[in-house]
């Protein structure tokens, strides 16, 4: 059996992702008690840019602050503007402290915010919640 030739795989260059030019999209802000994640997508739901408080450089309990959410939203908005994003509809999920701050910083970076919608899932008495924390 002849050895496999490696020339086919070695000559392959990694492809650069082409920039999508999307003028209108959705900003999904997931704000938990521990972190805030901002994903900016096109109208079909394909992610164009994202950032989280941990990715921006915050660690531990500082990730859950409103300032960390602000920095994450600014970073995601800047990346989305590189792809030509100008207008977003905002979908907010979760009970965290960075909800309003993230929306305000999206507006401050130059993105025009259209509709703001709260999509926090609430159970109709589904799963049993975790036990109370005793400190």
UniProtKB/Swiss-Prot annotation:
Residues 12-27 have a biased composition (Basic residues). Keywords: Ribonucleoprotein, Ribosomal protein, RNA-binding, rRNA-binding. Residues 1-27, 114-135 are annotated as: Disordered. It comes from the Bacteria. Residues 1-10 have a biased composition (Polar residues). InterPro entries: Ribosomal_uS11, Ribosomal_uS11_bac-type, Ribosomal_uS11_CS, Ribosomal_uS11_sf. The keyword Oxidoreductase does not apply. One of its GO terms (cellular component) is ribosome. It holds the Pfam family Ribosomal_S11. Part of the 30S ribosomal subunit. Interacts with proteins S7 and S18. Binds to IF-3. PANTHER family: 40S RIBOSOMAL PROTEIN S14/30S RIBOSOMAL PROTEIN S11. Belongs to the universal ribosomal protein uS11 family. This is Small ribosomal subunit protein uS11. The lineage of its organism: Bacteria, Bacillati, Actinomycetota, Actinomycetes, Kineosporiales.
């Amino acid at each position: 059996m002849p050895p496999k030739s490696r020339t086919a795989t070695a000559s392959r260059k990694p492809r650069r992702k082409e920039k999508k030019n999307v003028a209108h999209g959705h900003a999904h802000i997931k704000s938990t008690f521990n972190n805030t994640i901002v994903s900016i997508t096109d109208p079909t739901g394909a992610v164009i840019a994202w950032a989280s408080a941990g990715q921006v450089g915050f660690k531990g309990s500082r990730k859950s602050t409103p300032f960390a959410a602000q920095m994450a939203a600014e970073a995601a908005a800047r990346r989305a503007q590189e792809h030509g994003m100008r207008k977003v509809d905002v979908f907010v999920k979760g009970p965290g402290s960075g909800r309003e701050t993230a929306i305000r910083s999206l507006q401050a970076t130059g993105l025009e915010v259209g509709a703001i919608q709260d999509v926090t899932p609430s159970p109709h008495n589904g799963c049993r919640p975790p036990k109370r924390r005793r400190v």
